Amino acid sequence: MSAVKPLRKAVFPVAGMGTRFLPATKSVPKEMLTVVDRPVIDYAVREAVEAGCDTLIFITGRSKQAIANYFDRNPELEAELEAKQKKEALEIVRNIIPSHVNCIYIRQAEPLGLGHAVYCGAPLVHPEEHVAILLPDDLIDGHQKGCLQQMNEVYQRTGHSVIALEQVNWEDVHQYGVVKPKDEHVMPLELEGIVEKPKREDAPSNWTVVGRYILNGKIMQLLEKTQRGAGGEIQLTDGISELLKSETILGMPFSGKRFDCGSKAGFLEANLHFGLGLLKRGGR
């Protein structure tokens, strides 16, 4: 196997309107809603940076400027904090994102699905490199290390694309992308297929896809040719199905806890989890 290239680029599809959280998301992007003291998007970005990504590609929509503002410098705010000797707050504001990390913003012109959103990043992804894709709605508290870093270790060891997986109750498989593993007793799982939100009786397993992927850059070329599928949208799972025809893709059950911050219940659960963690550490 030739030398595995380091994982440097991460794509964040953040163009969704967040209608489940109206009226709050009428003026605030759902990715900027806070879990304790940080917006949801910040957790995913930190996870990507921890895994070594230094080029972050945000696929945005209208009314998402707050995301760019958050990761940009704010000289006026920094000057005020410095003048008032608020050193701790100044340190936090200056270090939201490391100086070596480059943020790029691409507008998705129309909402044609997750696959299309990912494809919007195609001009920045070379076919010979792998790229991370993180869905911020899936907020993951990794045990000892972030989910993407766990995946990156599998990628670096094998050179194969990696998808994060979680087992769910069979009654819930219709809510997720579901994979067909070659052998459920060999980890990480080698995948034979993937399907989007199948009925229970059609599901190949109860191993479901979590919003973390490390995929061969060729996925972009495949998504370009992908026809609209479920819901009239271009599905990322359809592109992955095509990629499976030409290469090995691994499924990795991650160590940690996932919160579905795309739902009100999951968002509340995440706030309770991280809030209690802060209190246990003596935070305020």
Where are these regions (language model features)?
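A conserved hydrophobic position in a structured secondary element of the catalytic/binding core
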Residues: 62, 134, 214-215, 262
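Terminal amphipathic alpha-helical/low-complexity segments used for targeting or macromolecular assembly
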Residues: 1-4, 51-55, 73, 154-158, ...
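Short, conserved catalytic or adaptor-binding loops enriched in Gly and charged residues
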Residues: 91-102, 183-188, 242-244
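Conserved core of the sugar-phosphate nucleotidyltransferase
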Residues: 139-222, 226, 230
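A generic "binding-loop/recognition-motif" signal
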Residues: 17, 28, 63, 255-257, ...
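Solvent-exposed alpha-helices and their adjacent loops that cap or buttress functional pockets
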Residues: 2-5, 24-25, 50, 96-99, ...
